[in-house]
Amino acid sequence: MDDLRYGVYPVKGASGYPGAERNLLEYSYFEKGPLTFRDVVIEFSQEEWQCLDTAQQDLYRKVMLENFRNLVFLGIDVSKPDLITCLEQGKDPWNMKRHSMVATPPVTYSHFAQDLWPQPGIKDSFQKVILREYGNYGHKDLQLRKGCKSVNECNVQKEGYNELKEYLTTTQSKIFQCDKYVKVFHKFLNSNTHKTRHTGKKPFKCKKCGKSFCMLLHLGQHKIIHIRENSYQCEECGKAFKWFSTLTRHKRIHTGDKSYKHEECGKGFNHSTTLTRHKVIHAGEKHYKCEKCGKDFKQSSHLTKHKTIHAGEKPYKCEGCGKAFCQFSYLTKHKIIHTGEKPYKCEECGKAFNWYSHLTRHKIIHTGEKPYKCE
């Protein structure tokens, strides 16, 4: 029964009871290691169970089923307890023949009962338990006064227990109340989660990328991204990819596969986007127009370069002579003057030129062509 306080109820912070902002899954995961259903089950004594009305018993069923589903979702290896089977079938979880909960062996008192068992100052004891277990939740009317902690510290009074049941019935709906929007929360998990959202605190941080989350559950979902990250590796070059489809496209580089073919010229491409760009050439489409001079361009990058002419910008400067150019290609051509490089060679006579246009004009000598005629 001692596991109940750690598995179900919110826990105190280091400086007292500041909202008790960690829920059962978060606390158990970080503080206690692997979680079991025993850690998250709520157990009642026979008297406590009979004290609950139909709505409260329904609430109990929902909370227990949700706790079990959370364990399964987190991938924790847990066998299905008899209590869960019983709750799923809508049966009463209290075994009247054995006088115990279905999931647990017979006990004299549950941990919950021991904590709430009264001494003559019944209200004081109950308020102290509420403050200890629920961190006050912003309710200033719950004053902390001196009272007993458990059944071992005071004499058990039967008439006091009946008084406790009445007080519990009138007070329980206020325990899980959000002090910001005055919403009443009946689920043990949701009260902490809702309050954390108001504070904006994100205590759960991803060690891989540093991103923070307000819920452990959200952190778990986020980690799937990193698990998948670069999990698909190319056997040829060792390059890794996040998605299998990206790896498939990459492999075409090694295989030489060019499955995207242009119907007009028959040219093949690795990717559909490359084929789309190629089609523009055949169509003669010019989508990008200069607002200054009206000149059209097939690609936006070409228009961007062209605009530098109108702007008068010359960002590309020659280190040799300080001359500036509006386009990088112009600077590249200019540098040949300083280097003395002549990459364009005539196959007929071996003469070299630093400009391709100069080579083209030179070739006319060998062909005997005379394109320029006097009118």
Swiss-Prot record:
Zn finger (C2H2-type) location: 176-198, 204-226, 232-254, 260-282, 288-310, 316-338, 344-366
KRAB domain span: 35-106
Domain of life of the native organism: Eukaryota
Keyword flag Signal: no
Keywords: DNA-binding, Metal-binding, Nucleus, Repeat, Transcription, Transcription regulation, Zinc, Zinc-finger
Cellular component annotations (GO), alphabetically ordered: nucleus
A single MF term (Gene Ontology): ubiquitin-protein transferase activity
Main location: nucleus
A family per Pfam: zf-C2H2
InterPro entries noted in UniProt: C2H2-ZF_domain, KRAB, KRAB_dom_sf, Znf_C2H2_sf, Znf_C2H2_type
Gene3D superfamilies linked to this entry: 6.10.140.140, Classic Zinc Finger
Disulphide-bonded residues: none
Record GO biological process: protein polyubiquitination; regulation of DNA-templated transcription
PANTHER family: FINGER PUTATIVE TRANSCRIPTION FACTOR FAMILY-RELATED (PTHR24384), ZINC FINGER PROTEIN 430 (PTHR24384:SF131)
Functional note: May be involved in transcriptional regulation.
Protein name from the UniProt record: Zinc finger protein 738
